[in-house]
Every structure is written in C-alpha cells, then in structure tokens.
C-alpha cells in the first residue's frame, strides 16, 4: 500500500455559538475512541476557562452516544465556542499496528492533520488527558513559516532510551511527546506527511515502534520542529503518588508556570481512585462543564484493575483495596 488508508466521515455535527473571525482563531483538535470522550469534554472546558481568545475545537472519534452530543452542545452554548464533531469509519485502519495500551485511535491525529489542512492553516493537537491551566495566546503569534510543528521534548526516562529502540534514526535528545503538537498544516500537506506516516507504520520498521504514532511523528519531523518550553506539555503520571506519601511533590512538576498538564499513564484524573491534590485542575474544569455531575470512571481494563487496588491501599482504603485486589486477580486468572 502506498497511501494512508481512506477514512470516511460517517457523520459531521457542528455547534457554533461563537463570533469568531476565522483568521485569528486557535483551532484545537482531539482524536479519541469512546473511552476518552468525557476526558475531551473536560479538557475543552479547561482550555476555555483559562483563555480569553477565539477558539474552535474539532473532535474526531469512531463512536459517541446521544448523551455526549447533548453535552458537547451544552458546552458550546455555555462558553460561546465552536465545536465540530467528526464521526469516522475506521475499518481501513485495521492494517495498522496497535498495542495493549493504545488502540488505533492514536492514528486519528494523522487523519486530523490531513483532513483539517483543507480548512485551517495551523492546529493544536491535544491528547484527551491534557488539562489546561494557563494561557495559549502566545501560540497565535508563533512563527511556524519554516517549521512543520512546535513540540515539547519528552521526559528523560523516555528520552534516554529512544536510541535503544530506534537506533537507525538517532532521535535521542530531540525526541518529543506527541500529546501536544502545534502543526503548520500547510507544510504538513505540502510534504505529504500523512502518506509518509502510513508507509512507515506499514513498513518493516514498525515492530520497533513502542509508541507507533509518536515514534513515526518523531522520525518524520526530525529537524523540522520548534521546541516549546516544558510548561506547554508538563508531563505528570499519577502513578508517582504511590511513592509520595505526602502527595505534595506534584507541585515540583505542576507549578505556576505550567500551561498544559499531561496526565500520562494508566491512571487518569477521571478515574474513581485518582483522589489526589494533583488532579485538582481536572476536577475544577469538570465542575465548570456539563460533566460536573458525572460519576468518576471505574476500572475497565486489566491494567486499570491493577492500578485501582494499589492506589486504594496507598490511600488507606484497605477493605476496598483488598476487594479491588481480588477483582484484579480474578480477571488476571480467568479473563486472559
């Protein structure tokens, strides 16, 4: 195959409650499956609460409920913004690799970069587990005329091992995290990068991609990016709370300068067992969104069941932790 799989838009909805001039709008996109939709809604709310600039949001997903559509419409009305919802058919993506942790929804950003290049010149892509706590206004003035994207380098634990996995590409020191990417869509399209990404994903090197979409973006954009400072992608894993009995060390990472918090790892701020001060920014945004009365999410995957019982025990919920541990062991033994 020599081109990116054709992805059909099955349904398109737009809720426009803004008075935006398209020339000065910060366009922001998300690409998710149904398990991350609520996270997207709260992420959008967090952006709006911290920014008084023209905004337009694009959500690309393969499934959604009528309830989600209703809440997205409420969000647009509540904050006077424009939200476009793209329901896509993804059968053609079955040829691409996926992992136990990441579904093929990780490729939706590649579709977003390609499809939205027909509509807008620049696009900020955010993962659904990114929460905003500062101003994004400077991105509107960022000069991307000679670079394809603006990104933030990944953390040292990932950075220092990248050449072991991708030795042929010499990415160490410049490897970036793809959870926050500000893209020059004109140059993306001119360089046919979606097509090139697919060729890499379907090629012989694919087995070495631990983070398929992120690895491919790093390979294609090597020496073609501007590096933004850490506040634009402040990576924090809630797993670190298991070792921090004070639950205060997060403030060494998430601080007054932080603009975007990226909650990486299996435990997300919307999980029922993520009861820590470090997720207050997510909770504040949720309380100012249509999802304010939604219950926190329970464990769904075997990995989440494992994380749940560990966090409950650390929090001193011993009985609940033992029950959760039993539920994890049961699934581990009988639901392989």
From Swiss-Prot:
Gene3D superfamilies: Spore Coat Polysaccharide Biosynthesis Protein SpsA, Chain A (3.90.550.10). A motif (DXD 2) lies at residues 213-215. Its EC number is 2.4.1.58. It catalyses: UDP-glucose + [lipopolysaccharide] = UDP + D-glucosyl-[lipopolysaccharide]. This is Lipopolysaccharide 1,2-glucosyltransferase. GO terms for molecular function: lipopolysaccharide 3-alpha-galactosyltransferase activity; lipopolysaccharide glucosyltransferase I activity; metal ion binding. GO terms for biological process: lipopolysaccharide core region biosynthetic process. Its cofactor is Mg(2+). Disruption phenotype: The mutant synthesizes truncated outer core region, does not express the O antigen and cannot invade epithelial cells. LPS contains one glucose and two galactose units. Keywords: Cell inner membrane, Cell membrane, Glycosyltransferase, Lipopolysaccharide biosynthesis, Magnesium, Membrane, Metal-binding, Transferase. Pfam families: Glyco_transf_8 (PF01501), Glyco_transf_8C (PF08437). CDD domains: GT8_A4GalT_like (cd04194). PANTHER family: GLYCOSYLTRANSFERASE 8 DOMAIN-CONTAINING PROTEIN, LIPOPOLYSACCHARIDE 1,2-GLUCOSYLTRANSFERASE. Pathway: Bacterial outer membrane biogenesis; LPS core biosynthesis. The keyword S-adenosyl-L-methionine does not apply. It is an enzyme of class 2 (transferase). It comes from Salmonella typhimurium (strain LT2 / SGSC1412 / ATCC 700720). The keyword Membrane applies. Mg(2+) binds at residues 127, 129, 262. GO terms for cellular component: plasma membrane. InterPro entries: Glyco_trans_8, Glyco_transf_8N, Glycosyltrans_8_dom-fam, Nucleotide-diphossugar_trans. Glucosyltransferase involved in the biosynthesis of the core oligosaccharide region of lipopolysaccharide (LPS). Catalyzes the addition of a glucose (glucose II) to the outer-core galactose I. Also has weak activity with UDP-galactose as the sugar donor. UDP binds at residues 31-36, 127-128, 262-268. Belongs to the glycosyltransferase 8 family. A motif (DXD 1) lies at residues 127-129.
